[in-house]
Amino acid sequence: MTRYVALLRAINVGGRTVKMDRLRALFEEMGFRKVETLIASGNVLFDTAARSAAPIEKKIEAHLFKTLGYDVETFVRTPAELAAVCALQPFADSVEHAKASALYVGFVKAPPAKDACARLMSLGNGIDEFRVHGREYFWSSLKSMGQSKITGAAIERALKVPSTMRNITTVRRLSAD
């Protein structure tokens, strides 16, 4: 069995409320084992014999659509992959942003195309800066995300694909499992 983390987009925001015990039950219905949730923002840890993330993502998305009645984009990583993300220093070239008060990690299903990366990077404004590494992007802000003029919707428009974000503290907690 392999341990995975499902990062669900837009759970418990915008009126899409799902209690964590219900979410765990939905994952158990799919045959996943040792299902746990971490904070009420769509982070689900589970074990499965499946070896590839893409079919797991599709299975979860189909089941959640069937049971909840709306699309839930799902991004699957292993705890080891998340630990590798946490070990990166994407802003090492910037003294200010290397020590920024807010660092978020965004997840997409496949590495963005070069033009998408360029569009994302162009959102940077000195206060908010971006870096892309594989299937993740990093958003460093000298303020809090709530004070930023950049939105998740603007990021998705730049990337032209759905994504979900977590703060680095949450990613560290998910990687420690």
Predicted regions and their residues:
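Surface-exposed, charge/polar-rich loops and edge strands
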Residues: 2-41, 45-177
